[in-house]
Curated annotation (Swiss-Prot):
The protein's name: Inner membrane-spanning protein YciB
Pfam family of the protein (one): IspA
Residues forming coiled coils: none
Function: Plays a role in cell envelope biogenesis, maintenance of cell envelope integrity and membrane homeostasis.
Paired cysteines (S-S): none
Subcellular location: Cell inner membrane
Main location: membrane
Similarity section: Belongs to the YciB family.
Record field: transmembrane: 27-47, 53-73, 76-96, 118-138, 149-169
Upper classification of the organism: Bacteria, Pseudomonadati, Pseudomonadota, Gammaproteobacteria, Pasteurellales
One annotated Gene Ontology cellular component of this protein: plasma membrane
Membrane topology: Multi-pass membrane protein
Length: 185
């Protein structure tokens, strides 16, 4: 339910854009995002920090898009958010020696430190790729192509990155059913 709720604003944005246009789609996106946060708070008692940041960015850039009737503000949001995610992951790993992926998944998975660093770096590269592809599409293709990319392309890229991460993690999982604390083979 929670994951489905994350996609509702995007789906409504896509449909409204195809039926109405940029301004209408941006307004629907902002309203749906605010409702999503209200529902999450009501149903689960809290909203995760990452969701608050994303919702704030959607509301800010969505309102700019609606006010100016110009999609470039939402295009900037995708670029900025992906860039920030990459920077945060890289700074945490190289400056503070703490792979954030480990903080997110460390309770569920026991992996060697090298694996956490590789995963963290891989996701940082993924966000950089998303940022660069977004810049390319938003500057060199039609508005409709960008909306399609935003609605489906990034999701597809995320699924591929998740599968690659899963395959990478699999090699560190215990083979005999034991629960190895350090995740070493």
């Amino acid at each position: 339910m929670k994951q489905l709720l994350d996609f509702i604003p995007l789906i409504l944005f896509f449909i409204t854009y195809k039926l109405g246009g940029v301004r209408e789609a941006a307004i629907v996106l902002v309203v749906a995002t605010i409702l999503q946060i209200v529902i999450l708070k009501w149903k689960y008692g809290m909203v995760e920090k990452q969701q608050k940041i994303m919702a704030s960015a959607v509301v800010f850039f969505g309102l700019l898009t609606a006010y100016f009737n110009e999609i470039r503000y939402l295009q900037w949001k995708v670029t900025i958010i992906n860039g920030l995610f990459a920077i945060v992951l890289l700074v945490a790993q190289f400056q503070f020696k703490t792979p954030l992926i480990k903080k997110l998944l460390g309770k569920e998975l026991q992996l060697p430190e090298k694996a956490w660093n590789t995963l963290n770096f891989g996701w940082a590269i993924f966000f950089i790729i998303c940022m660069l592809v977004n810049i390319y599409i938003s500057h060199n293709m039609s508005e409709e192509a960008w909306v399609d990319f935003k609605s489906f392309g990034i999701i597809g890229m995320t699924v591929i990155a998740t599968i690659i991460s899963g395959v990478y993690i699999y090699r560190y999982l215990p083979k005999d059913g034991s629960n190895s604390k350090d995740g070493e083979k």
